[in-house]
A protein has these predicted regions:
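Active-site helix of classical SDR
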Residues: 116, 152
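SDR active-site lid
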Residues: 166-230, 241
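Substrate-binding pocket helix/loop in short-chain dehydrogenase/reductase
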Residues: 92-93, 97-105
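Conserved glycine-rich cofactor-binding loop
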Residues: 11-12
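Conserved NAD(P)H cofactor-binding loop of Rossmann-fold oxidoreductase domains
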Residues: 84-89
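Conserved glycine-rich Rossmann-like NAD(P)H-binding loop of the short-chain dehydrogenase/reductase
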Residues: 25-41
């Protein structure tokens, strides 16, 4: 029986790369993003599989519940959930627009949590459910000048690791992908493309492949790239104040 994967933020960047990987393995897809035109183009491009298009802004209240309602109405069984949608903002906390920061919290945390909650019953039915939550190396230390973003990714990592333990008996694996700087439209939205951190950004297809393979193997946490692995490890042993200073330095423009 053909399996189905639900992918958020599917119209570009890592989400688009995940669409390609799942499609190439013959998965049917439920693709979610704000840009309906791009989603419909994906449906046309991958005509060999069934793709359900759900144009939805996950930063809006009730979006996750509406997605679940549509999935149930169409009687779609779900085997894999990829929580990829998210964004960041560069700047001091007090100078960034508070509404944008609250939207970030809602998208990066609340929507991810809510969609996972609503889809868990479906994942349990599959007997071999898989969840991939996209966090970041930002999850491992505080991030001055991206304070809220770093905090949201720390939540994603902690939540995912706890959920992985809870769901072991249900044969559901939870994989947390923690990429460092990656070449996607995230950098332009967050306005970090000219920072030291993004001077050696990885390509989105390589990052997605590593995340996909880890997901299929049922791994827990995967950090992409050797440099990022070293940085995440160092952050665990550095005093928190020192780690924050280092994070602040890499946020400076070249």
């Amino acid at each position: 029986m053909t399996k189905t994967a639900v992918i958020t933020g599917a119209s570009s960047g890592l989400g688009l790369e995940f669409v390609k990987l799942f499609a190439n393995d013959g998965y049917n897809l439920v693709v979610i993003a704000r840009n309906e035109k791009k989603l419909l183009e994906l449906k046309k491009e991958f005509s060999n599989i069934s793709i359900t298009v759900i144009p939805k802004d996950l930063s809006m209240p009730n979006a996750s519940k509406e997605i679940m309602d549509e999935i149930q109405t169409k009687k779609i069984s779900v085997d894999v959930l990829v929580n990829n949608a998210g964004f960041g903002l560069l700047g001091s906390f007090e100078n960034l627009d508070i509404e944008q920061q609250l939207n970030m919290i809602h998208l990066n945390i609340s929507s991810l949590t809510e969609l996972t909650y609503h889809l868990l019953p479906e994942l349990k039915k599959s007997k071999h459910g898989k969840i991939l939550n996209v966090a970041s190396t930002a999850a491992f230390q505080p991030g001055p000048n991206m304070a809220v973003y770093y905090a949201t990714k720390a939540y994603v990592l902690s939540f995912s690791e706890a959920l992985a333990e809870e769901l072991k008996e249900d044969n559901i694996t939870v994989t947390t992908l923690c990429p460092g700087a990656t070449k996607t439209n995230f950098s332009s939205v967050a306005k970090v493309e000219n920072t030291k951190m993004f001077s050696n950004a990885m390509s989105s297809d390589v990052v997605a492949q590593q995340g996909y393979h880890a997901l299929m193997q049922g791994k827990g946490v995967v950090i992409t790239g050797g440099f990022n692995k070293v940085g995440a490890l160092a952050a665990k042993f550095l005093p928190r104040r020192t780690a924050a200073k280092v994070a602040k330095l890499v946020m400076k423009e070249n």
